[in-house]
From Swiss-Prot:
It catalyses: D-glyceraldehyde 3-phosphate = dihydroxyacetone phosphate. This is Triosephosphate isomerase. One of its GO terms (molecular function) is triose-phosphate isomerase activity. The lineage of its organism: Bacteria, Pseudomonadati, Pseudomonadota, Gammaproteobacteria, Enterobacterales. Pfam families: TIM. InterPro entries: Aldolase_TIM, TIM_sf, TrioseP_Isoase_bac/euk, Triosephosphate_isomerase, Triosephosphate_isomerase_AS.
Amino acid sequence: MRHPLVMGNWKLNGSRHMVNELVANLRKELAGVAGCDVAIAPPEMYIDLAKRAAAGSHIMLGAQNVDLNLSGAFTGETSAEMLKDIGAQYIIIGHSERRTYHKESDELIAKKFAVLKEQGLTPVLCIGETEAENEAGKTEEVCARQIDAVLKTQGAAAFEGAVIAYEPVWAIGTGKSATPAQAQAVHKFIRDHIAKADAKIAEQVIIQYGGSVNASNAAELFAQPDIDGALVGGASLKADAFAVIVKAAEAAKQA
């Protein structure tokens, strides 16, 4: 049985005070939670501080992006080796905000995926369609293309131990969310698509849902058989709201 993962993407939010306070509150809220893995991805300069604040708890650390290169003259970038060195394990790649604002291509994201795997880190591969693509009935086509960028260059085995986050772009930060049935249909498609290459890997891969996940819709989303947790944005900045989502994932998968 797949173990759910709920991960908080803090995006461009944080301060030393906020990190210490939020992690301290998360430790209290999540004490006793064992049936769901939990990770947080603060801005890079706060990962080490968050790691120390979370020491001794089950909270794992992640990052919001990574560069292709391990070292060299690449101003402003952060390598997989650096993230590994400071204790980040779950690395988000391909987030729609990176695809949109930084023009990151499927091919570039697949290369980042490979670098992370080589370093023993866990890629959290974000995929998902825009509102226009959704309305044009291209959801499955887009998701397949984004997955195939990895499948066709690295094979299905690359997804062993990796995480996929399905985030319909039209639902990120908008307050809109796919219905549980809509989300489940896409998650099943993603799993079935990988299964064409390797059924065992497909059955094991964690597929999160992301896109305005909150305390009120989490339980119904997690009740779906192919939804294995969530990649949470805004709600991850509030310990009580994030904890409700984590506990909903734990309860749904133990039911």
